[in-house]
Amino acid sequence: MAKIVTLGEIMLRLSPEGNDRFIQSESFRIIPGGGEANVAVSVANYGHDAYFVSKLPKHEIGQIALNALRRYGVNTDFIARGGERVGLYYAETGASMRPSKVIYDRAHSSIAEADPSDFDFDKIMEGAQWFHW
């Protein structure tokens, strides 16, 4: 199968249960995701060799995102580790006439502060048939 490389930010979505609003909720579900990460999971589900390139903190919160990718068979060998933050977004499901709401909190995330020297792009792209970012 094809080697497909995606590069981007995996974030953690924090969502209240059901149709609760942010201000009504005392707890949130954590769901890892993000455009390029979702593409990597999708192509892995189709049997391709999916590689995700990003940067995540070394702490347990970064590990949540890393484990989510691995659970779906995405290769995480090229995820640099460092920095302090995983990007977050809060998603509130709409109900009836109330629209859904999304609030982003991704400033100063590990990937936002990554340096090109954090990645060996020659090695990353070796044998790749497709690059998505």
Language-model-detected regions and their locations in the chain:
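Conserved N-terminal subdomain of the carbohydrate kinase-like
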Residues: D49, V53-W133
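Glycine-rich phosphate/adenosyl-contacting loop at the front of the ribokinase-like
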Residues: M1-V74, I111-S117
